[in-house]
C-alpha cells in the first residue's frame, strides 16, 4: 500500500524555484532514500513534507489525505515526523527531557512511558545517560538521541534528514544499523543522505535529486552503479531516465 505520494511538487523561495515537479512514492514499511549533492533541494523537500515550509504547487497525499493542507502539529499527530539535519537538540536539557519533547501531542503522551522504554531498549546508551545534558554527549550519541526523540512521537512515516552528518565512519555504520532496526518495526522512512553507500545499504529504492529535479530513480541495487550515480549527482543523467524500476 502506498503511504506517501508526491506529484509535481514545486518549491520556491520568492521567485527562485529550488525544487521543480518532483514525483516520488513511499510504500508502507519501506525505506526510500533521496540522494543528491549539497544544494540539490533535499532538505527543502523534507521541510515541505514536515510542514515548516510551504510548497508553490503540486500534490502530496499521505495515506490518501492532502498533507499540504495539514498544519504542522496535525502532521505529527498523523505520524509524519521529522528527524532534522544537524539533530537540533536542546543542549541544556537532559536526555530524558529531550526525549519527552518528542511526545508533546496528545496521542503520543498517552503512551509516553511505553515509548520511553522502547527507545531505551533500542538505544541502551540513552538509558545509561538519561539524566545527562544532551550537550555533553558525543556526536553519535546525539544522533541516537535525535532518532529516539523522533520515535517518541510514534511515527508512521519518519523523515530522516542527513543522519550521518559530521559522524566518524565507525559511528555512521552504527547509526545505519539502528536505522535498519527501526525499519524492521514497519515504520516507513524517507531518508535524505549524501552518503549514498550507507543510504543504499538500508533502502529498497531511491531517487537522485540534482538542481531541484529528480534525474534518476531506481532500486537500491540499480543505484549502486557508482558511475551512473555520480553522473546523476551532477545532473548529467537525462530526465527521461528518471523512471522507477521496481524489483
What spans do the regions from the language model cover?
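Glycine-rich phosphate-binding loops of nucleotide-dependent enzymes
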Residues: 1-247
Amino acid at each position: 500500500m502506498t503511504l506517501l505520494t508526491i506529484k509535481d511538487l514545486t518549491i520556491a523561495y520568492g521567485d527562485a524555484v529550488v525544487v521543480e515537479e518532483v514525483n516520488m512514492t513511499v510504500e508502507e514499511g519501506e525505506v526510500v532514500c533521496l540522494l543528491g549533492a549539497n544544494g540539490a533541494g533535499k532538505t527543502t523537500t523534507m521541510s515541505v513534507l514536515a510542514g515548516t515550509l510551504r510548497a508553490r504547487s503540486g500534490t502530496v497525499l499521505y495515506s490518501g489525505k492532502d498533507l499540504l493542507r495539514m498544519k504542522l502539529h496535525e502532521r505529527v499527530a498523523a505520524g509524519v515526523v521529522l528527524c532534522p539535519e544537524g539533530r537540533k537538540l536542546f543542549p541544556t536539557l537532559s536526555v530524558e527531557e529531550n526525549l519527552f519533547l518528542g511526545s508533546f501531542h496528545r496521542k503520543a503522551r498517552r503512551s509516553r512511558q511505553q515509548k520511553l522504554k522502547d527507545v531505551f531498549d533500542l538505544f541502551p546508551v540513552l538509558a545509561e545517560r538519561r539524566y545527562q545534558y544532551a550537550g555533553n554527549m558525543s556526536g553519535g550519541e546525539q544522533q541516537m538521541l535525535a532518532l529516539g526523540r523522533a520515535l517518541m512521537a510514534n511515527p508512521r512515516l519518519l523523515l530522516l534528514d542527513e543522519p550521518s552528518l559530521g559522524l566518524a565512519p565507525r559511528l555512521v555504520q552504527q547509526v545505519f544499523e539502528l536505522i535498519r532496526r527501526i525499519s524492521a518495526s514497519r515504520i516507513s522512512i524517507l531518508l535524505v543522505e549524501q552518503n549514498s553507500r550507507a543510504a543504499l545499504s538500508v533502502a529498497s529504492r531511491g531517487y537522485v535529486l540534482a538542481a531541484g529535479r529528480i534525474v534518476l530513480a531506481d532500486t537500491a541495487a540499480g543505484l549502486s552503479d557508482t558511475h551512473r550515480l555520480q553522473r546523476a549527482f551532477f545532473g548529467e543523467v537525462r530526465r527521461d531516465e528518471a523512471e522507477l524500476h521496481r524489483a
